[in-house]
């Protein structure tokens, strides 16, 4: 067996294993367990796109009571959520998310770099004290599926 065949076999096995875990997560969610999903947002130009994905996700599963969603924001994207410069539509969407129970986590490192506190952000945010990427890893270790649209 040559190296290429061994590599192909290993990749096929890995793909089957990963596909099985995704199928298991989907089956568990369909069996009455709420699916847990974390959305990752760092690109400023994707703010509206990601928020739209979350809205579509909630609508697609039949409402916020059927899914647990967290949104972790860091880097340039966080500027869009500064209270002083956020547009009213964005403020309404964030308020709706907060009322729906979506965790809105702002990276503490980014907040420090942008010289903003939680009171300077739109209402509903919590601070990811250890950093946004650490919060993403924590949520994934708790069974959240990771999405970065």
Task: Mark where each language-model region is.
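C-terminal segment of N-terminal export signals and the immediately downstream linker at the start
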Residues: 20-42, 46
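Extracytoplasmic
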Residues: 34, 64-66, 99
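Surface-exposed patches in mature extracellular/periplasmic domains of secreted proteins
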Residues: 64-70, 106-109
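Histidine-anchored nucleotide/phosphate-binding helix
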Residues: 50-63
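Acidic helix-start/capping segments at beta-turn-to-alpha-helix junctions
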Residues: 68-80
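N-terminal export signals
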Residues: 5-25
């Amino acid at each position: 067996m040559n190296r290429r065949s061994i590599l192909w076999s290993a990749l096929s096995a890995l793909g089957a294993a990963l596909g099985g875990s995704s199928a298991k997560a989907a089956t568990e969610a369909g069996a009455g367990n709420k699916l847990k999903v974390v959305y990752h947002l760092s690109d400023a130009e994707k703010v509206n796109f990601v928020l739209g994905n979350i809205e579509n996700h909630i609508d697609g599963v039949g409402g916020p009571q059927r899914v647990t969603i967290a949104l972790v924001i860091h880097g340039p994207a966080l500027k869009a959520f500064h209270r002083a410069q956020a547009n009213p539509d964005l403020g309404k969407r964030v308020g709706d998310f907060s009322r729906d129970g979506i965790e809105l986590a702002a990276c503490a490192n980014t907040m420090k770099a942008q010289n903003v506190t939680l009171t300077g952000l739109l209402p509903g945010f919590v601070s990811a004290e250890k950093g946004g990427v650490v919060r993403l890893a924590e949520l994934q270790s708790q069974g959240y599926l990771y999405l970065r649209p």
